[in-house]
Amino acid sequence: ITLLALNKIGAIGVLINTSLTGDPLMHCINSSDSVKCIVGAERADALEDVLDQINITKQEDFLWAEDTAEFSLPDWAIDLKAQLDLSDDQNLEETNSVKAKDVACYIFTSGTTGVPKAAICPNQKLMAASINIKMAGYRIDETDCMHNSLPLYHSTGLMLGLCAVIQAGASTFIKRKFSASSFWDEVQQYNTTALVYIGELCRYLANTEPTQAEQNNPLKVMVGNGLRPDVWDIFKDRFGVDRIVEIYGASEGNALFMNLLNKDKTIGMTNAQVALIEYDVAEDKIIKNDDGTCKKITTHDPGLLIVFISPNSVFNGY
């Protein structure tokens, strides 16, 4: 709700991993040039630990959201709900000037090759991705409900999950943390017909003992990334999922592969201009021909995927 509200007035939402503490948390706040911070009560302690290291300093710029009654308002923040109660319910003038090219949010990379980087996500990318995923991937409508237990600060949970649901006019069951033991009970209770996944989540489910709740379940389609071939078979055969749409892409990437045709164990196709080139993993460098050009992969060997940047395949940067 917060992200949608910020987007409506043209403000940029900076989506920060809620498990971060210390220097990584400080880096994400400062590198994004954030001027205000909305923090859930359960994460206030982690934020308080870096208060003297971040660029946001005024009490009125820290908005504290009470999730449960067990937490109390810290003296360095103001109560978000109290501010909302004072707000006008009429649209602000700024809502009329928001454009498709404007930045919707910053989505941080995982930081596996260094510190997390804030990938720029314009409105048009958010809209195009969610529309394509809804229409060509899930093929859901207002009668469907999606199970989403992925973090909304990453592209999978946000774009493949929440935004696709909004585009479809469907409903969603959002869970703060995934639980393999209660998953099928939730699917049955909320009649979730769609699932947004990552491979690790599916592996946990595949390793569980069979339960009554998984029998005759309503789940018919799942979209996500990282599904291993052996787990793929389990979701088709044991769990009876008719359509599995594996995705391959990146938050900052300008190409998206999608298993549109429901072929087993494939990332599918893309309309972007791409090439697979030879890459030396040990030396961390591209292998080139004598004339300095890249060497294309001609067999089924692994390589480095590169994507041509064009007006139709834009790289928005960091």
Model-derived features: positions:
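Conserved ATP/PPi-binding loop(s) of AMP-dependent carboxylate-activating enzymes
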Residues: 281-318
